[in-house]
Amino acid sequence: MMTKEAPLIALVAGEISGDILGAGLINALKLHYPNARFIGVAGPRMIQAGCETLFDMEELAVMGLAEVVKYLPRLLKRRKQVIETMLAEKPDIFIGIDAPDFNLTVEEKLKASGIKAIHYVSPSVWAWRQNRVQKIARATNLVLAFLPFEKAFYDRFNVPCRFIGHTMADAIALKPNRSEACATLNLDETQRYLAILVGSRASEVRFLAEPFLKAAQILKQQYPDLQFLVPLVNDKRIAQFEQIKAQVAPELSVHILKGNARQAMIAAEASLLASGTAALEGMLCKSPMVVGYKMKAMTYWLAKRLVKTKYISLPNLLADEMLVPELIQDECNPENLAWYLGNYLADDADHRKQRNELKQRFTELHKLIQCDADAQAAQAVVDVLEANTSDQN
């Protein structure tokens, strides 16, 4: 039985983004339960917030099928360890943060033994592998969703879900400060910039760097004063990008940045980016964007048959309309990319009006998902802990 003042709260995060969410949630929960104890699998931020960790979170942070297969015995051993520890400790609640392939099985086992379970960050069940919703229903007392269309999806299947808003929408100002962004990046704010984000994964850089760079070459001919900002997540991606650039666009001058994608998109007039979280971040930065994506032909063939949504980018999914161009596979070629970006760079009255209208829509969508997500998530945990789960709106 839970002692109201000092619940035992378990959390498992599997990567950096989950560690950030976990730390925000722990700090918000402490306002409700100053004497709570937090255990689980934590990264540095969660540990700093006061979470005891069973092992280094890095052990769960594997990407891609090949890596998962390679580390599967270790992952299964760690999952068994987490389940056994939780069954022994009997936390008042277990919160799996993202990492659904790891966490949903843990949640299902714990819920079956009478431990309340929450899954924080909905897997993309609304887009593909929709049959997973049955497992999520069995595994959880509540799903915490970043986006309103995710809650609408769970409502269709009668799975308890609460929309809490997006932490990124809380972190970015409704009116981003371009002067500040330029100063942070040591850029001349009188210049014109285009941000180019080729993705954080090696496969994304491999497929997108060439068409994105060639599109930049076309735009440079049309707009000689245009400069290019290329934020990359780490040294590996920088080296990979520079190698491709040396082959396809050796003469093109670009500003390569380590990190700082957000500042780059705020400083730039427009962005060319890979689908994914970057598109949501670009929308919150009020950056007119073109979304481009390429993958292996076989992967694309499969994805076309599996993906159930009309759009691939989060701004379009949120708006439920084609707000920003999505150029996928063969359409993601330099000429198309440059043409659509040209609409954002042209300086006539019609194009200026279109850009302002787009930014206004971005602001409306920003407000829709700016809900103080840490506090909302904490309140949802409190409600489940105290069994007040009748209203999950």
Swiss-Prot record:
Pathway: Bacterial outer membrane biogenesis; LPS lipid A biosynthesis. InterPro entries: Glyco_trans_19. GO terms for biological process: lipid A biosynthetic process. One of its GO terms (cellular component) is membrane. Transmembrane segments: none annotated. Keywords: Glycosyltransferase, Lipid A biosynthesis, Lipid biosynthesis, Lipid metabolism, Transferase. Belongs to the LpxB family. This is Lipid-A-disaccharide synthase. It comes from Actinobacillus pleuropneumoniae serotype 3 (strain JL03).
